[in-house]
Swiss-Prot record:
It holds the Pfam family Helicase_C. ATP binds at A157, A158, T159, G160, S161, G162, K163, T164. This is ATP-dependent RNA helicase DBP2. Its EC number is 3.6.4.13. Keywords: ATP-binding, Cytoplasm, Helicase, Hydrolase, Isopeptide bond, Nonsense-mediated mRNA decay, Nucleotide-binding, Nucleus, Phosphoprotein, Ribosome biogenesis, RNA-binding, rRNA processing, Ubl conjugation. Belongs to the DEAD box helicase family. DDX5/DBP2 subfamily. Residues 20-33 have a biased composition (Basic and acidic residues). It catalyses: ATP + H2O = ADP + phosphate + H(+). The modification Phosphoserine is found at S88, S90. It comes from Saccharomyces cerevisiae (strain YJM789). Residues 347-494 form the Helicase C-terminal domain. CDD domains: DEADc_DDX5_DDX17, SF2_C_DEAD. A motif (DEAD box) lies at residues 267-270.
Amino acid sequence: MTYGGRDQQYNKTNYNSRGGDFRGGRNSDRNSYNDRPQGGNYRGGFGGRSNYNQPQELIKPNWDEELPKLPTFEKNFYVEHESVRDRSDSEIAQFRKENEMTISGHDIPKPITTFDEAGFPDYVLNEVKAEGFDKPTGIQCQGWPMALSGRDMVGIAATGSGKTLSYCLPGIVHINAQPLLAPGDGPIVLVLAPTRELAVQIQTECSKFGHSSRIRNTCVYGGVPKSQQIRDLSRGSEIVIATPGRLIDMLEIGKTNLKRVTYLVLDEADRMLDMGFEPQIRKIVDQIRPDRQTLMWSATWPKEVKQLAADYLNDPIQVQVGSLELSASHNITQIVEVVSDFEKRDRLNKYLETASQDNEYKTLIFASTKRMCDDITKYLREDGWPALAIHGDKDQRERDWVLQEFRNGRSPIMVATDVAARGIDVKGINYVINYDMPGNIEDYVHRIGRTGRAGATGTAISFFTEQNKGLGAKLISIMREANQNIPPELLKYDRRSYGGGHPRYGGGRGGRGGYGRRGGYGGGRGGYGGNRQRDGGWGNRGRSNY
């Protein structure tokens, strides 16, 4: 989604006038960009344009030589609200304690507690209030003053905590303070994300809140043809949201450059490193002027992310909401059933029957492989359930369609792999079902975090088999921390009680009358389709070959 030329400009002198002309008489600044010769002496940044369509290896500029040639830019826009200024240190400490907020660094601005205290110009504030938000989230209360002050920062918060707006809104203010884009300029704000789904989600927020400023944005990701993305980049966009691999492709063929980037965001940095993007991230960041503002966001704080921050952030300040210890939201009810593989389908049906009692239910089912995703989806659809699958072998158009069907509730059951589900933010997911357990406890917490978001409650069901015994102790620890009921069958895998006996799998759950009555999975649900007739014949929705 792109917009026309931006006609609002911000400067420091009229910041508190709210809603005035934000151009601020910066014509000389704009001309300094328009009159500047295009091109330069390094590829991907100011690089030369020979062999424009042929990939050219990105070369790190000599910033000691290049930086003095670049125009200066504004990045500190924060004006502390008088209500914030008048709060005592003890009040601030109490607020941070109540919000489980930990800070580090020096000269950290005080947190705000309302949208008005954030000091956003009217064109931003009006967009926020139009969305009907009651108050800022914890990470926004501290993150906005940090980001608006122009400091490099690290934000550590769980998915669904409001972190996207924590960097998106200050980014919009940052853009409106800079000279307008000239033909051939790249973005002012660059957001790197691990997956196309998260990138599209970020673009939606940027479009929504940048609309009044006519700020254009482009989303650049793999899995689709480059042609449309190239056209969008050529028209000029103040914000580019990108996955690392596709952005490097665009830089190497000269379809964009990073010479105007002064606000860099690394979103879900831990996931990007988990997915092996560190070399690409480093290659990209090396192309950006070192006096930029950099914001790094992560759900966890492992040593690899710490090292990346140490290498690329300058004297950063840090805010963390919640514990650094891996934990699950206490809004989620965790149910673990110790089963054998052949019991999983019957258990799945049981929980879907429970979930479907809610007319607006959404259930996300995780499987370990693409093939298993398709197998589960095929089985469920044959059994009358409105299920669709999403995984890496499906093209982007089909993935987008599946996500849309899931979001609007026409297909309230989605089966996904971990990779396909990363970055997906769908409101109203009531149930997460781990048909196959993930390979590590971090992915378990990430999976079940798809429900119970933004203060809502949710339920996570996991089918634990003997093959998952390596996860047992850590899973029990996560459940204990969240005060969950731990089934006796699972305690076999607890280091604190290892070696103890355990009841037979599934004993005492009952209610199914035994597996024999099903007459085999193919025909045991003969009357089920009649119960789904209200769905308009889900088997004939025109996507029967999905």
